[in-house]
Structure formats: C-alpha cells, structure tokens
C-alpha cells in the first residue's frame, strides 16, 4: 500500500495517543486496587454476598410446598408470595415466574417442581424469616415431583379452587401429605370470582378432609388479597426444620440440571451442619468425592452465598461432569465414616411404556445424548435399548403417564431439536412360566414383559397378570349414569361411593391400567361437559385373561405390530389396526390379505384389492374361448405372484399404525 509522509505522521500520532490511553487505564486500575487493599486493611474485607445464611436460625426457617389440582392457581399464588416478600418486583408481567420451561408456558401447566427462597421481615421481629417455597405440578403424571417435594418439607398449602371445588387430585395430594405427617394449611383460592362458592367448598373440605371451618384461609392469587394472612399462617402453623446445626454436613439431593460450562448443578436441602465453599463432599450412592466450587440460594435466580446452613435449600456446583453422577434422593455429606445416609426416596414405577426412535437413524447419537440430559432433570423415566426392524435402533422408555410422555417428547424437540417417532403406548405385564428349564432361562417364575415381542411362548405360560389402578372420580350427580356406564365399559369394578355435597359425588373404581391410560380421561371430560375430574394410583398386578395378537400380511407375521390385549378387546383392537394398515399399504399387482390373529384363530380380516389390468383390451371380438384363455392365464400369474411376492410395507405405514392416535 502506498503511504505519504503525511499519512505516516498521522498514524504515528494516533499510535502514541493509543499508547498513552493504555498507560492511563493501567494507572487507574492500579490505583483502584491499591485503594481497595488499603480500605480492606482498615475496615475488613469488602462485602461479597448479598445474603448471609447465618442470620437465619432454624427456628426462623419454614420449608413448605403448594399442592393442588390442575389449574387451581398454584403458580399464580407463588407469584404473589414472591411479590409480597419483595423477592421480585411487583409487575403485571409476573406470570408463572417459576415455570421456566417452554413447555410449561406453552401448556400453562407446571411440569417441574421449582424451589425459591424468600426473605420475609415480619413486623415486630428483629430477625428475618427464610421461607423456602416449592411450587409443585398438579397433574397426576408428575406426582413423583410432588413426592420429592413433600419429602423435604414440614408443611403444605392445600390449595382448592373456590369455583370448581375439591377435585380428584386434591384428594390424592391430601392423602400424600397426611401419610407423610405434614402440617396441612387448607386454602381457598379465587374467592373474588362471581361464581365462587366459598361456603359450599369449605363444607366439602370439612366432609372429605376433616378440616375445621375456621382454619380454612381465603385468598385471591390474582388480586393478592389474603396473601399477608397466608404468610403469617405459614410462620405460625408450619413447624421449623429439626436438623442438627452443629453436626457435620449432610444434605438431600432434591434435583439437578446440567450446565455446559459448570457441569451438573445440584439442588440440595441441607439437613444437618453447614456447607462452605471449598468443602469436600461425598456421594453416599456412588462413593465419589467432590469439591464445592459455588453455592447459594435460588432467589429465584442463583444468588451466591458463603455457606448453606441446616434447614436451608440451595444450589451447589461441584466438579460433577457427567449427568449420570447425580442421583435424586442421594445423600451428600462431609467425608466421615460415622455419617449415616438419609432415607432414600421410593423409586417411581413407570406405568406407560413406549418406543422412541429417531426420524433419521443418522441422528441416533444426538438423540441418545439428548435423552441422557433430560434424564438428569427427570429421573422418573426408565430407559432400555431396543431395536425394531422397521424403525431401526431406538429406546424403550417408561413414563408415569401419557402427559408425562407427551411433555418428555416435546422437551426433546424444544430443548434439543430432536425429532422422534413415538410408538403406541403400552403397559408392563407379568406372566408366570412353568418348567424348571424355563424358570432358569427367565431368572424366575414371574417374568415382566415391557415389550409384546418379548412375551414367552404361550405353551410355557401358566398365568397372565396385568397392572391395576385405583381410580377416583369426582362428578356432578347429573352425569352419574353416563360415568358409571363408561367405567363398566372399561372393565371397572366399583369400590365406593361418597357424597361430597348435595350436587357432587365421589366414585372409586378399580381399573385395568391399560383401559385408562390412553383416552379414558378425554371421554370422561366429554360425557360430563368437562365438569368431572379423575385421578388414579397403581395398586399392583392381578391375574387376567390376556392374549398375544399378531398381524399377518398374506400369511406372514409382522413382528413389529405384535401386541398384548385382553381377550374381550382383541377383535376390536385387531380391526382398528387392520383399517389403519389398509390405508397405508399401496395397492399391489395381486390381492393382499391383512389378518389379525391369536394363535391359529383369525379375529379380523381386511383385503387390499389388486390393481386392475384389462387383459381383454387387445380382443375386439372373435371366439369367446380366446378371452377365457387370457383371463385364466392372468389369474394364474396373480396366484404365483401372491405366493412368491413380498409385500413391501412402507416405513410410514409402521409409524402410522404404531403411533398413538
């Protein structure tokens, strides 16, 4: 490049100016450092943290969660509690502050239990209170999240919609809290609505839960009325944690999530002792040691602190690099031989199983990584590898319910951009085999079958067992006949009936789990105009009459479409599958027979007609025997093609038949 003397002079001047600026900046920095060091010698170290956990003795700590039926206002009440305690600024934009997942905001439901620490300065008290709130999901499919929350709390807010009244999940949440021996605060929400029946719903709670009428608090989470009285009741009625503050640290791993830069971030409830930066902790489940790199409160964002004391909940960043190192329910403590682990959580039992496959097999490794990351945040899902000739390699996943499965797959899509194919959901069955050789082969007399393809040969099966569920239905009395008819049609056995009030009835049935996991709730809502509610819990296995149904195409078994059904449902399910398959398989040069069979017995059949060919097109008249000869020859060719021809079933056909509707 050509440069004039003027240009060189201009560049040298600006270069000198730049160097002078750098020296000036270095001088300022050194002066600031010097001033800071001098001031620290005089007045001590500068304040590093916004919150000092040591100012909260255990008697000033309350750990509680909010439990309620779906859409009764848990998240809205959490927003008002955060605003009243000045944890967040009051704003009209504060909606579902603790619902951080995209799927939660899109569906308007809580999927993950979220923890937040609130500092409350009670009038007339010098020392502040620390209120640890856990906002829990309301749907039955996420009951494991509620169970984890209940395990570390001393009290619960039982929230009931004053407009809708007590619902089925409300009963389940009450039973869970009651069995855990927690203090229960009954609270009526949405009392500001015109149709709110405060007295009527209070009577419902009195009849079902035995609560005293004067103990029921009345709030409006939308307007914020009654929130101050609720906070005062939390402090007065819910007991403080009873850990040993002077003992060595011991904490309960409540939840965890993954950060690509810091690794695994654990959510801990400190039970005993104090945890500080730099402490060495050990996992009682894996025996691995870690060094604490960062810790603090969730307020609701991460707020670093110098320590976590007994009774407090907070996040901990140690050198956990693999998502598989964090186990929910694990005990993390200081290294010591005399520290006993805390009681473990009861493991969740998957109720619904489905196959998950990548839409493109080249994305198999990426999907495996995405599933591992989600399992860190959702340990209730069980995973095993499976292979399908039609769909390729995939995974068999166990979920707590259909909504749980829906949300899991949606999170795969939204958070990891993983497109998946989900097969039709099924439940886990059990069979009893006989014969010493067979018992040795399967490792016991009882064999659990999560995949219909893995069902042992029926000649060695002595008994079949299917999972059962205890269902609770709360419905207006005007729909009683329709609801009863639906329950009987789903093979339900009535157990009890109770009047909630003059217009509402509580029904309890025992159902086969397979009859209620897919579309029972939708049908119940449909026949009751949306007024009924439903909740269920697994009650174990019972002997049943089950069969393995196979789909045949031109006499050849298609293993991928094998399923297990009850004998009374076999024909209906078989017919439905054949109709879907018929729509998906293109016409061939020969007729194709689709059959649903149990053993040698055919239960249903559908035919795909052959493509028509006008073999008489070249005959314009003449002897009739010529036409007969051509028709006969064409018929023989079709028979031969049918015997030796392979019907190629498109991959899309398997997806449409196996995919849930």
UniProtKB/Swiss-Prot annotation:
It is found in: Mitochondrion inner membrane. Keywords: GTP-binding, Hydrolase, Membrane, Mitochondrion, Mitochondrion inner membrane, Nucleotide-binding, Protein biosynthesis. The keyword Metal-binding does not apply. It is a peripheral membrane protein. It is an enzyme of class 3 (hydrolase). It catalyses: GTP + H2O = GDP + phosphate + H(+). GO terms for cellular component: mitochondrial inner membrane; mitochondrial matrix; mitochondrion. It comes from the Eukaryota. GO terms for molecular function: GTP binding; GTPase activity; mitochondrial ribosome binding. Residues 59-242 form the tr-type G domain. CDD domains: EF4_II, EF4_III, LepA, lepA_C. One of its GO terms (biological process) is translation. GTP binds at residues 68-75, 135-139, 189-192. Its EC number is 3.6.5.-. PROSITE patterns: G_TR_1, G_TR_2. This protein may be expected to contain an N-terminal transit peptide but none has been predicted. Promotes mitochondrial protein synthesis. May act as a fidelity factor of the translation reaction, by catalyzing a one-codon backward translocation of tRNAs on improperly translocated ribosomes. Binds to mitochondrial ribosomes in a GTP-dependent manner. Belongs to the TRAFAC class translation factor GTPase superfamily. Classic translation factor GTPase family. LepA subfamily. This is Translation factor GUF1 homolog, mitochondrial. It comes from Ixodes scapularis (Black-legged tick). The lineage of its organism: Eukaryota, Metazoa, Ecdysozoa, Arthropoda, Chelicerata.
């Amino acid at each position: 490049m050509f440069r004039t003397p003027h240009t060189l002079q201009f560049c040298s001047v600006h270069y000198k100016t730049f160097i002078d600026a750098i020296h000036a900046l270095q001088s300022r920095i050194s002066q600031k450092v010097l001033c800071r060091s001098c001031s620290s010698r005089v007045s001590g170290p500068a304040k590093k943290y916004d919150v000092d956990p040591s100012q909260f003795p255990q008697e000033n700590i309350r750990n509680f969660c909010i439990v309620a039926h779906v859409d009764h206002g848990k998240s809205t009440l959490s927003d008002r509690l955060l605003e009243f305690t000045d944890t967040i600024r009051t704003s009209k934009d504060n909606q579902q502050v603790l619902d951080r997942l995209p799927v939660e905001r899109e569906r308007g439901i809580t999927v993950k239990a979220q923890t937040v620490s609130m500092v409350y300065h009670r009038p007339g008290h010098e020392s502040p209170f620390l209120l640890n709130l856990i906002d829990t999901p309301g749907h039955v499919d996420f009951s494991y999240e509620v169970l984890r929350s209940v395990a570390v709390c001393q009290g619960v807010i039982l929230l009931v919609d004053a407009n809708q009244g007590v619902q089925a999940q409300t009963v389940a949440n009450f039973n869970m809290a009651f069995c855990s021996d927690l203090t229960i605060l009954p609270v009526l929400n949405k009392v500001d609505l015109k149709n709110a029946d405060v007295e009527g719903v209070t009577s419902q709670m009195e009849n079902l839960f035995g609560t005293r009428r004067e103990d029921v608090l009345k709030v409006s989470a939308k307007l914020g009325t009654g929130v101050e009285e609720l906070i005062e009741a939390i402090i007065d009625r819910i007991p403080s944690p009873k850990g040993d503050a002077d003992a060595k640290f011991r904490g309960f791993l409540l939840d965890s999530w993954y950060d690509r830069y810091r690794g695994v971030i654990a959510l801990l409830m400190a039970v005993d002792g104090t945890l500080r930066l730099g402490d060495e902790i050990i996992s009682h489940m894996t025996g691995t040691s870690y060094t604490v790199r960062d810790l603090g409160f969730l307020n609701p964002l991460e707020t670093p602190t110098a320590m976590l004391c007994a009774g407090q909940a907070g996040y901990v960043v140690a050198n956990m690099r693999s998502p598989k190192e964090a186990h929910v329910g694990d005990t993390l403590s200081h290294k010591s031989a005399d520290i006993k682990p805390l009681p473990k959580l009861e493991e969740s039992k998957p109720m619904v199983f489905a196959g998950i496959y990548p839409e493109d097999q080249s994305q198999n490794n990426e999907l495996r990584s995405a599933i591992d990351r989600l399992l860190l945040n959702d340990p209730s899902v069980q995973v095993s590898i499976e292979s399908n000739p039609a769909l390729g390699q995939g995974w068999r996943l166990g979920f707590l319910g259909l909504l749980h499965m829906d949300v899991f797959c949606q999170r795969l899509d939204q958070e990891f951009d993983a497109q998946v194919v989900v097969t039709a959901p099924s439940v886990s069955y059990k069979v009893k085999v006989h014969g010493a050789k067979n018992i040795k082969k399967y490792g016991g007399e009882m064999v659990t079958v999560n995949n219909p393809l893995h069902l042992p040969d029926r000649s060695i099966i002595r008994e079949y067992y299917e999972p059962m569920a205890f269902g609770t239905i709360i419905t207006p009395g005007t729909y009683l006949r329709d609801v009863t008819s639906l329950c009987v049609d789903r093979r339900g056995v009535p157990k009890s009936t109770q009047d909630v009030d003059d217009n509402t009835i509580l029904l309890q049935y025992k159902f086969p789990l397979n009859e209620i996991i897919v579309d029972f709730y939708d049908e119940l809502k449909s026949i009751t105009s949306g007024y009924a509610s439903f909740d269920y819990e697994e009650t174990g296995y019972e002997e049943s009459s089950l069969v393995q149904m196979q789909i045949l195409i031109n006499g050849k078994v298609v293993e991928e479409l094998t399923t297990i059904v009850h004998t009374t449902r076999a024909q209906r399910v078989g017919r439905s599958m054949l109709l879907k398959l018929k729509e998906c398989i293109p016409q061939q040069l020969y007729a194709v027979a689709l059959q649903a069979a149990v053993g040698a017995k055919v239960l249903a059949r559908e035919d795909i007609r052959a493509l028509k060919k006008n073999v008489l097109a070249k005959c314009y008249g003449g002897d009739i025997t010529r036409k007969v000869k051509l028709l006969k020859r064409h018929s023989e060719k079709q028979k031969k093609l049918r015997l030796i021809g392979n019907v190629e079933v498109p991959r899309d056909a398997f997806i449409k038949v196996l995919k849930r509707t």
